[in-house]
Amino acid sequence: YADGQTAGRPALKAPVTQEAAFTRTGERNRVTGKETFTAWTPATKELAQEATPVVTGFVADKANVAAKTVTPDDKDSEETVKYSKLGSYVPNVPDGLPKVPNLPYPNDPTDPTKPGTDLPVIPHVPGTTPVGPDGTTPLTPKDPSDPSKGYNPPPIPSDPTQDTPI
């Protein structure tokens, strides 16, 4: 996780290790001490692309670790995928009225780098009309003839790790 915290969060996929094996033979001239080697076999090796899994409630910084061609002269390398917590719609209900819990943004089921489009319904609190993050624009009811069915949320911000006040 990008913030280093793991307690109370979904378990992440175990690290994936890909190895490339190269071989060659060598000889040492017993008179001169000179060593000679054959060419490496294979000369290059392709490491496979690794898809980043979706982790509920989080977005990843990359959709996959790209395939990579390595040679015997390459140093060991490591790729890290960082997950950041998705933001939420944060209802600000006036004192004395029933509180509404934060509504986390959904995950995209196929792209770990984006929030989903299956947005939650903002619950209706009698006596109030929820407004968007600008603090003045009312949210539109799911059913204009029956606001008790809740409201359509505003769009998720371009940085999906940021909360949206309602």
Regions found by a protein language model. Give the residues of each.
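Extracellular modular ligand-binding repeats in secreted and cell-surface proteins
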Residues: 1-166
